[in-house]
Swiss-Prot record:
UniProt-annotated stretches for the region Interacts with SPRY1, SPRY2, SPRY3 and SPRY4: 131-142, 167-178
Biological role stated in the UniProt entry: May act as a scaffolding protein within caveolar membranes. Forms a stable heterooligomeric complex with CAV2 that targets to lipid rafts and drives caveolae formation. Mediates the recruitment of CAVIN proteins (CAVIN1/2/3/4) to the caveolae. Interacts directly with G-protein alpha subunits and can functionally regulate their activity. Involved in the costimulatory signal essential for T-cell receptor (TCR)-mediated T-cell activation. Its binding to DPP4 induces T-cell proliferation and NF-kappa-B activation in a T-cell receptor/CD3-dependent manner.
Modified residues (Phosphoserine): 2, 9
InterPro entries associated with the record: Caveolin (IPR001612), Caveolin_CS (IPR018361)
Protein name in UniProt: Caveolin-1
Region (Interacts with SPRY1, SPRY2, and SPRY4): 149-160
Intramembrane segment spans (from-to): 105-125
GO biological process: apoptotic signaling pathway; canonical Wnt signaling pathway; caveola assembly; caveolin-mediated endocytosis; cell differentiation; cellular response to exogenous dsRNA; cellular response to hyperoxia; cellular response to misfolded protein
N6-acetyllysine, modified sites: 5
Region span, Interaction with CAVIN3: 82-94
Cross-link Glycyl lysine isopeptide (Lys-Gly) (interchain with G-Cter in ubiquitin) per UniProt, renumbered positions: 5, 26, 30, 39, 47, 57
Required for homooligomerization: annotated span: 2-94
Taxonomic placement: Eukaryota, Metazoa, Chordata, Craniata, Vertebrata
Modification after translation: Phosphorylated at Tyr-14 by ABL1 in response to oxidative stress.
Length: 178
């Protein structure tokens, strides 16, 4: 397995796929990572996507799983002909399937582009604007918090301590009259 090639059991020579070989910046195969005492790094931009399970985090479990039975139902005693029911089921299912494919074919790439730009802008603003503003605010507020702490310990603590001592001598007695 030298030079990014391997031999199968029948003696055929193959090159490893690019994803297993890594790139020029970080090796992504186990042999090179072990040789360099590094952990194997996977790039999020070149990872393979799962074409079978397209919702691995179950984002749409409660929302988009709409089947024929979820939309159209005939109660007991009010049934159409069996052929009509089967044709309606087939029409609904096939129409939903192909119309979704048509819409995703037309609008899928542009919407992916729009959402990619949107989340890139959000990430950029969070990294380069929001977090630095919050950090600078926390640094600047430390000065005010120290002055406020001195003010509270100097003026408010003695005042409220004195008020507490005044009210601590109040005794209440209750009597029940019949």
């Amino acid at each position: 397995m030298s030079g990014g090639k391997y031999v199968d059991s029948e003696g055929h020579l193959y090159t490893l796929p690019i994803r297993e070989q890594g790139n020029i910046y970080k090796p992504n195969n186990k042999a090179m990572a072990e040789d360099m005492n590094e952990k194997q790094v996977y790039d999020a931009h070149t990872k393979e996507i799962d074409l079978v399970n397209r919702d691995p985090k179950h984002l749409n479990d409660d929302v988009v799983k709409i089947d024929f039975e979820d939309v159209i139902a005939e109660p007991e005693g009010t049934h159409s002909f069996d052929g009509i029911w089967k044709a309606s089921f087939t029409t609904f299912t096939v129409t939903k399937y192909w119309f979704y494919r048509l819409l995703s074919g037309i609008f899928g790439i542009p919407m992916a582009l729009i959402w990619g730009v949107y989340f890139a802008i959000l990430s950029f603003l969070h990294i380069w604007a929001v977090v630095p503003c919050i950090k600078s605010f926390l640094i600047e507020i430390q000065c005010i918090s120290r002055v406020y702490s001195i003010y509270v310990h100097t003026f408010c603590d003695p005042l409220f301590e004195a008020i507490g001592k005044i009210f601590s001598n109040i005794r209440i007695s209750t009597q029940k009259e019949i």
